Structure formats: C-alpha cells, structure tokens
Amino acid sequence: ANHTPLLGSAGLTLKSYPYYDFDHHRLDFDAMLAALKQVPKDDLVLLHASCHNPCGADLSPEQWQQITHLAQERGFVPFIDMAYQGFGLGLAEDAYGLRLMAEVLPELLVAVSFSKNFGLYRERAGGLTLMAANEERARACQSQLLSLARGLYSMPPSHGSALVDIIWHSPDLRRLWQQELTDMRVRIQTLRQALHEGLKAQLPERDFGFIVRERGMFSFLGLTETQVTRLREEFSIYMTGNSRINIAGLSLARIDYVCDALESVIRA
C-alpha cells in the first residue's frame, strides 16, 4: 500500500501488474508473466524479495529464474523491495531472487529495510543499493540520489544503522541476532500452522491451506468488509478492510478464540 504514494510522489508514471489471485489464494504467475512481457526497455519493475506484503505469496526459485530471463530479454530494470529478509525460509533463501538477478543482470535497484529483522522500526534503518551497467551510469545515478537525499533529509540519523553495523561486525552478536531471527521465523510458522489447523477443524468445508503455504507476517483471509467489521465490533479482532491479517500479532493462547470468531462471522 505504501509503494503507490511513495513512487507516485517521486513523479513516476505507475502501472500495476497482476500478482495475487484472491479467489484461489495463490500467486497468479501466468498473468504476472504475461504483463511483464509488455514492459518496455529501461522501465522499473517492482518485486518483493520475500514475505510478500500484503499477501504472503512468494515467487519460487523457478519463477525468479523466469523473471530474470525476461528482464534480460526485455531490458527492464528490477527494483527489489527487501523488508522481511529472514522471516520466510531463512536469510539466504529469502535473498535467492535478488542474488540471482545481481549475478545475471547488468542493472538492479534494491531497497533494504532493517526495521523488522533488526527490531529497529522507529529508527528507519535501511539502504538503497544501485547496480549500474557501467561506471558512467553509476556516477550519474549517484549524483541524482545525492540530490534527492539532500532535499529529503540531507544527513540521515545514524543510530539505527550504527546498531546494525555493530551487530554485523561482532561474531557473537551476529550469531545471537541470527538465532533470534530464526526463533521469530519459527514462531510465525507455528502460528500459521495453528491457525490453519483451527480453521480446518471449525470450517472443514473451506480450504485454508494457503495460510501454511504463504510466508512472512501477512495473509488475506478472504473475508468481506462486513465480516471484517463484525470481527472488530463483536470480537475486538482487528485487520484491514480487505481482510489482511498480521499473523505475528496472534498468540497460541488466543488461536481458538480467533477461530471461533471467524467461524461465527463466516457462517452467519
């Protein structure tokens, strides 16, 4: 939801491409690929590295390979948003598509955020990496980025980035961070499994398998706005109007309550 106002305010002309099939709760890769085959040379194509926000449906390694080949063929430039590295399958696994494209393509943009995987949400720590085809293009892009930065914040705060730097350069702290990130990833996966099992028991006629197939914090439950409103007003369960739920906001102790509430509004 943030991409459209952010990129639009930068003066870019925006076009969307198909991605998520809401009816079947899955990535509509054929429709996505068909749309990307129409992208002109040098256009940017925004892609999520992993743990897609808002739907949780990620590209497979084979699909990343197809898009990489298409980028070579069409000449468009991938712009990869990596805000949840480590919450999907692992640090290396979640960066598969990014690393593949960096090896194969001449140009690439990568926006990385440490807000979630370092717990630095209020510090706004992150960075933009630009890979250019040659030194001349790299210098031109750097000049433009410096001009933009000067107009936005001039000198960014260093506290959050300094914390990331300390953790990365300390073997002990880095191991601890990796273990804590693993713990959080396993917690989210456990919550997904518990929610799926609870809903399967309460509503056996509906397929909630997408909950365990998807990755990261978010999934769409496929509810109507009326059902979402009832959950909020009658059960104090909050989610966005399109039924995007934050899996990480659940707890095992409250899964049964959530499943009971969902059964109530769905069967009404």
PLM-predicted stretches and their roles:
Residues 1-12:
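Substrate-binding/gating loop at the entrance of the active-site cleft, primarily
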Residues 142-161, 167-196:
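Structural signature of PLP-dependent enzymes
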Residues 176-234:
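Conserved PLP-binding catalytic core of the aspartate aminotransferase-like
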Residues 10, 73-74, 104:
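Helix C-cap/helix->beta junction micro-motif
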Residues 14, 78, 108, 238-239:
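Hydrophobic beta-strand scaffold residues
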Residues 97-140:
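Active-site PLP attachment segment
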Residues 21-87:
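Active-site phosphate-binding strand-loop segment of PLP-dependent enzymes
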